[in-house]
Amino acid sequence: MAEICKMKYTVLDSPLGKIELSGCERGLHGIRFLSGKTPNTDPTEAPACPEVLGGPEGVPEPLVQCTAWLEAYFHEPAATEGLPLPALHHPVFQQDSFTRQVLWKLLKVVKFGEMVSYQQLAALAGNPKAARAVGGAMRSNPVPILIPCHRVIRSDGAIGNYSGGGQTVKEWLLAHEGIPTGQPASKGLGLIGSWLKPSFESSSPKPSG
């Protein structure tokens, strides 16, 4: 019988409003936008460091790591490269599926300031014809921002939908990363603000046990 996770929660105040983190000792379960307010900071300005609004004592290490990562993302994005990613323990990461494969590939391959089309991401995940399924995987992403589904846009340059917090939030995140939108997919090499080259490959991290 599978062990039931003892869930803990903490809340951050960010330029995008309040963000709730949920998880257990074994890993992060979710990142959720609590307020649908318009982002209160111009992405071209350096936002104030997010404030931790509260959470239970004895916050699990995965939530501590995720909090530090998000604080760096909003305030000093380059610092995220040197920070550990929290283990992930949402059920979607505990079973072998195309959705998990897509999410891991997105996390590992598409870095800050890069963008990828649904079709390109499908190819990276091993099925170039599965662009529609990639869209479904993005809607199933339990940890937006950390797994950057906001960097997945349409081949014609339109940003597409964003279940993480709506199109306004997606536009803010792309602008925060210096990603220009409205440009069709091209043979970019994955530099800041460019399309990711479809043939770029990398190994995937492992989910928590």
Curated annotation (Swiss-Prot):
This is Methylated-DNA--protein-cysteine methyltransferase. Zn(2+) binds at residues 5, 24, 29, 89. The modification Phosphoserine is found at residue 14. Belongs to the MGMT family. It comes from Rattus norvegicus (Rat). The keyword Ion transport does not apply. Its main location: nucleus. GO terms for molecular function: calcium ion binding; DNA binding; methylated-DNA-[protein]-cysteine S-methyltransferase activity; methyltransferase activity. SUPFAM superfamilies: Methylated DNA-protein cysteine methyltransferase domain (SSF53155), Methylated DNA-protein cysteine methyltransferase, C-terminal domain (SSF46767).
